[in-house]
């Protein structure tokens, strides 16, 4: 799920300065040359109003040009698409009343310009040998690929453990659904695990963006681990969203789950109320029945439209499991062949779920 607009700008900027891009190559050249730099990633009337001195260039961007221009005093201004160098050796004069927590002149200017213009600004420190990015109201130090990969691999190992636990609780839920023994606790535990896995994956996606071309293998591993998780998230909520709930639609509930604090996410009672369950302390032990979305999604070659019609017609998974071929054919869009496929598919799923739980 998408985060706030500031996060989108932040990630887009990280992608633009990721290893393997011409711009990152230019920054690395500046670092290796032991010089500093102040670079504004965008140009408009507001930026122009902060610029004094220097000279206009309007030439095509290249890493070598950026490196050579950084040798001069003053800031460099690039076009918003980073394809052209607009100005160089300019003196930036931001509003001194704009708050900043930085101490060095270059970094203070960078933070103020970023806040005042709402364009990303990069400050390359000659003394500390770091690249600091100021964007969307935050400061972020760009690390090398080795440091990012180390953090990403730790997060990936955590994701693998959480995914393994998710598969266990999801398998248990499937078996309980077949036996019609599901409680609110069982269903909410799966939603909780799905949200935890999604959050870890979202963090790893940030590393993938930051790594650029160095993040290809990490991206493939993430894709493999997260296959089907987002769909499972939606179907679990649709299966157990109480009828007439004030929580709203499944999409609204998923959005609220994404916005929950880490502390609230660990509390199953709070989680249950977000999904729409109401009641006292015994809310988690209340028995509930799924509609059947999760189970029907596992039947091969069954279109989503047909799944919706089957759920609308039968109402609960238990009625679906009890339905014969003739009963299934009564649903619009379900012919004899598809009815048999659904019947056999549900029977196999029921058998395998029970076996996995007890054998």
Swiss-Prot record:
Domain DAC span(s) in chain numbering: 7-146
Residues passing through the membrane, by range: none
Pfam families listed in its UniProt record: DAC, DisA-linker
Keywords: ATP-binding, DNA damage, DNA repair, DNA-binding, Magnesium, Nucleotide-binding, Nucleotidyltransferase, Transferase
EC primary class: transferase
Gene3D superfamilies assigned to the protein according to its UniProt record, in alphabetical order: 5' to 3' exonuclease, C-terminal subdomain, DNA integrity scanning linker region, DNA integrity scanning protein, DisA, N-terminal domain
An example Gene Ontology biological process: DNA repair
Cofactor: Mg(2+)
GO terms for MF: adenylate cyclase activity; ATP binding; diadenylate cyclase activity; DNA binding
Family note: Belongs to the DisA family.
Protein name, entry field: DNA integrity scanning protein DisA
Organism in which the protein naturally occurs: Frankia alni (strain DSM 45986 / CECT 9034 / ACN14a)
Taxonomic lineage of the native organism: Bacteria, Bacillati, Actinomycetota, Actinomycetes, Frankiales
Gene name linked to the record: disA
